Amino acid sequence: MLHLLGIISLAVAANAQCPDYIDYSNVPHGPFSGGQYNLSYMRPDPACRTFNSSIVEQTVDRVSQGIADPDLRRLFTNAYPNTLDTAIAWHGYANNSDEELTFIITGDINAMWLRDSANQMQSYLPLLTASQAFDSLASLYRGVINLQSRYILTDRYCNSFQPPVESGISPSPNPSASEDTVRPNYTNSSVFECKYELDSLAAFLEVSTNYYNATQDASFFKNYQWVDAVKSVLQVADEMMVPTYQPNGNVSELAYSFTRLTTRSTETTANDGLGNPFNNGTGLIRSFFRPSDDSTIFQGFIPANMMFASYLKSASDIMYAIGDQDDLAGQMCDLSESLRKAISNHGIVHTSNYGNIYAYEVDGYMSQNIMDDANIPSLLSAPFIGYLDRDDEVYQNTRSLILSADNPYFMRGPVINAIGGPHQGGSHANQMTDQATHVCRVGKAKVFRISISDLFTGPMASIIRIFTTDDEAEITQQLQQIVSSTDGLGLIHESINTFNVSDWTRQWFSWANGLFGQMILDLEDRKPEILGQSFQNNTS
């Protein structure tokens, strides 16, 4: 009966006369906020929402009452429930099983990214409690963990996936992936894109840890495929610590390679799909791509190694709690500790102006890439991902650098000042909104590729900046810039032209929207007086 109720509830939402949210979210709707920016109301009708949670609705109502500014209040109301409102494409069960599965799309792309889906669920972590009910947040979490386990065991190097066969949803074509040459091979029926990103595997450990810490439900992890998926993650870690060159000078045969026929360097890798040379003895795990889905310059990608070390250690607590897995848990702890040592030995660089800082990428050959990107994990997000404390000296030095003009991707302008990145590249795009090919919906339903000369920046970095400071003036400034830069739509965009508020990408980007709401809940706990401020008649 429980299975039937779940199927019925999903069928009702699917069969309702509901507009396509890509179109709906691109046009303002009343009632408007009535503030200086007069933000649109962007929540679908309750019958059209993809998942309804009473605890989330109660939280939206309660927190909204403590937000004095009408525009900030509307932005929170729209953004926080966005994943539940629009992105739970399917929630059900594996065939002939009580194994819960949850297929979460990114928003405007009908595919499930390991990283995005883990972070979309993290938005609701403050509300997560133990429950066996199918319509609970806990059930959504279990479904994500189970489906991610399946995905990793199917294609452990891939980053985004098609709907499970049980959903009845057809796979989505990915034209850009037709130009990919990837080892090991994969099929488009199960994989949307196969860019190996270490942070995607860290995200699986993250969502697992978040669920366990909130519910203490160790028994869940004994079932199904979670332990085997963790073993597969550790196999990737081992395979990706192999250097480019063997001791005798021969090139190592890596377990993974990737090339794409493209005009953009960030969409493929050097040296016939192996990437730039990576030295022996660093102790770091290689990553071919960043969380932006852009290729790394140097494969010792420090933020992903930080995230992996952090959540590998916390996930070992689950493995110990399961019982009969102490050896595996010990391996996880040991690898986490060795990664921390490797980051300290190879990821910290001395600079004359800032002292010791963390590099963004290294190769073990004394080459470093000094920058930061808006996407998480980033250097800015190191405290957010649990790697270190906010007052860590090297972090504070790094933070000073990456929030300055010495970071080549710190974008400045009259609209918003924040960290951006190279994810948006030049030339015109086709009409498909597709993260894999960097085709983006830009203001008023126009579709373009964005040139770096347009100085696009990511609001996600502004949100993380708030998470990682107690400076009330800094928090207030960042909130003001976020509230004033939605072009009246009242949703968090993927990126914004720092000189043109009406030039932006991806209004339906559920992760960023949920992250904004999560940040407001954090402020309610840490700095509630800020939520009582007005952001009217201010300038950014």
Name each model-derived stretch:
Residues M1-Q17:
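Fungal secretory targeting signals
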Residues A16-R115, D155, S176-A177:
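Low-complexity, Ser/Thr/Pro/Gly-enriched N-terminal "stalk/linker" regions
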Residues A47-D69, N119-F134, A203-S219, M306-Q325, ...:
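Well-ordered alpha-helical scaffold segments within catalytic/enzyme domains
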Residues L75, A133-Y151, D217-M240, A315-H346, ...:
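Extended, well-ordered alpha-helical scaffold segments
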Residues L84-E100, S170-P184, F278-R290, G488-E494:
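Active-site-adjacent bridging/hinge elements
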Residues N110-S265, A512-E524:
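Aromatic-rich carbohydrate-recognition surfaces in CAZymes
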Residues L114, L153-P164, G168-P173, Y224, ...:
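Extended ligand-binding clefts on enzyme/binding-domain cores
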Residues C158, S167, H423-Q431, A436-R441, ...:
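CBM-like carbohydrate-recognition segments
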